[in-house]
């Protein structure tokens, strides 16, 4: 009888510790280094900038200002002027004194 091993139900809990105790995987984040270290390698492209600025100086002219005219087309009032002058057909009589 003494050899009766205790109930296995009591042993399983001890074998697998609660998952809450498991660390939150702090190691994965360590794999990716800080992004601050990457900018240094982006500096090389900066050398191209010297030739890029020239083209930008040519844009200042901005001859697109005419684009502001488009809104003018939206002015429906323009249709009224034609109404002001009556049809010339009624003027013929005026030609004969």
Swiss-Prot record:
Coiled-coil spans in chain: none
The keyword Aminoacyl-tRNA synthetase is annotated on this UniProt entry:
no
Q: Where is the composition biased (Pro residues)?
A: 9-22, 31-43
Composition-biased stretches, type Basic and acidic residues, lie in 76-97
- This protein's source sits in the domain of life called Eukaryota
Which region ranges are annotated with the description Disordered?
Answer: 1-97
Q: Does the keyword Transcription apply?
A: no
Which UniProt keywords are present, listed alphabetically?
Answer: Nodulation, Repeat
This entry's comment on induction and repression of expression is:
During nodulation in legume roots after Rhizobium infection.
Stated role: Involved in early stages of root nodule development.
Which protein family is it in? Belongs to the nodulin 75 family.
**What is the protein's given name?**
Early nodulin-75
């Amino acid at each position: 009888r003494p050899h009766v091993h205790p109930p296995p139900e009591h042993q399983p809990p001890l074998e697998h510790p609660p998952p809450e105790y498991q660390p939150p995987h702090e190691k994965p984040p360590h794999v990716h280094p800080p992004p601050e270290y990457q900018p240094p390698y982006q500096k090389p492209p900066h050398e191209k900038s010297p030739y890029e600025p020239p083209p930008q100086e040519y844009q200042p002219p901005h001859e697109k200002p005419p684009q502001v005219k488009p809104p003018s087309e939206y002015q429906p009032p323009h249709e009224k002027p034609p109404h002001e002058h009556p049809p010339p057909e009624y003027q013929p009589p005026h030609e004969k004194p």
